[in-house]
Amino acid sequence: MKTVIVITGHGNYATGLKSSIELLAGQNGDLYYLDLMVNDTDQMLKEQMTNVVKKNKGSSVLFICDILGGTPFKVSVEIANNSDHMEVVAGCNIGSILEGVFQKDKISVRELADSMVSSSKRTTVRFETVNKNTVIDPEEGI
């Protein structure tokens, strides 16, 4: 089953990610970017999301939201709540979203959601400086 991805969030979150995703992975007609701007209502966002779902009838849908518990998340959950072919995730980083874009038609939407959450956890790190006297083997890379 084909999977479409809806990226949504506050302000220009979604369209900002669109710029990065298209730079790194190219354009993809199965990705939708829905911003919730200051004068938008939850009902307006719900209508946009519902239109994407209707346009892609028969496809699985993964909603990627900026913040757990925010309006885009709540609206996504409301739409996905009664469907076995829709999932909602929140707080994923660009690396995990890119992984999801490349995996989306190879695994189920549930596996995709789980994979993206795991990837975000695994790739969120804090850089630690290396002792200046430590010799680093250039063959090891960064």
Across the structure, where does each feature detected by a protein language model lie?
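N-terminal loops that bind phosphate or other acidic moieties
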Residues: 2-64, 68-142
